[in-house]
Amino acid sequence: MAVQKNKPTRSKRGMRRSHDALTTALLSVDKTSGENHLRHHITTDGYYRGRKVINR
């Protein structure tokens, strides 16, 4: 098993963790129903880009 020779510095630790930040979900408002939904996904009513695509 590999064992480190020296303790990594706070700077190196921070550089390694720089890509670990969480991002918020991008929400859009539907043109027809005014409902919030994820980008490139249909709403719960079945609308996508203002058109009815699924009968629910």
From Swiss-Prot:
Family annotation (Pfam families): Ribosomal_L32p (PF01783)
Region of interest (Disordered), ranges: 1-21
Keyword presence, Aminoacyl-tRNA synthetase: no
GO biological process terms on file: translation
Entry GO CC: large ribosomal subunit
Compositional bias segments (type: Basic residues): 7-16
Record key words, sorted: Ribonucleoprotein, Ribosomal protein
UniProt-recorded Gene Ontology molecular function terms: structural constituent of ribosome
PANTHER family hit by this protein: 50S RIBOSOMAL PROTEIN L32 (PTHR35534), LARGE RIBOSOMAL SUBUNIT PROTEIN BL32 (PTHR35534:SF1)
NCBIfam families: rpmF_bact
Recorded family membership: Belongs to the bacterial ribosomal protein bL32 family.
Protein's name in the database: Large ribosomal subunit protein bL32
Source organism per UniProt: Hamiltonella defensa subsp. Acyrthosiphon pisum (strain 5AT)
